Amino acid sequence: MAKSSRSKTSKAWLKEHFNDPWVAKAQEQGYRSRASFKLLEMNEKDRLFRPGMAVLDLGAAPGGWSQVAGQLIGGRGTVIASDILAMDALPDVTFIEGDFREEVIYEQILMALGDQRADLVMSDMAPNMSGNSAVDQPRAMYLAELALDMAERVLEPDGVFLVKVFQGEGFEDYRKALQSRFKRVVSRKPAASRARSTEVYQLGFGLK
């Protein structure tokens, strides 16, 4: 019975995915995922990218956000992408495969940054969803906490932190944690986010 239920859920997801206008738009414009449009919209509102900056993209695969960063910054800055999953190469993006919680991967990230700190740390990480919010929400919050920890370690004092968070248990506490660490915190729900999704992006500007 459970297997049948999962099969129905998978079929429904596939139908939604292939009928999604943002997925079609991504394919037409050569972006790796619909997530690219979320970042493009947030950049229009918040001017996240500028020439010469250093960007760290956590949980980057398949590369939708790194692709945008690479295009907007080009060879005039540094874009570092990290994920435990493999990712096809992108122009002007340095990819580091592995778990950034591990010291060896963290050191590789620092080496890629060189003598600079990151101007923008961004995370679109999400766990593999089971459909059980009691399981999924803590996993999602844990990933957001990992991203925040990394941001505090590598960000410039006036840097920006962009992270995906899911509304639910732990969300308000996480937002308070951001407000205690950053001078300004704003929420964003891009048009390319699915309406039924509880995801909401948090932006922290300038470490306190």
Swiss-Prot record:
Active-site residues, Swiss-Prot/TrEMBL: K164
Compartments reported by the entry: Cytoplasm
EC id: 2.1.1.166
Cellular component aspect of the GO annotation: cytoplasm
Name of the featured protein: Ribosomal RNA large subunit methyltransferase E
Organism field: Alcanivorax borkumensis (strain ATCC 700651 / DSM 11573 / NCIMB 13689 / SK2)
Purpose of the protein: Specifically methylates the uridine in position 2552 of 23S rRNA at the 2'-O position of the ribose in the fully assembled 50S ribosomal subunit.
SUPFAM superfamilies, per database record: S-adenosyl-L-methionine-dependent methyltransferases
Pfam families registered for this protein in UniProt: FtsJ (PF01728)
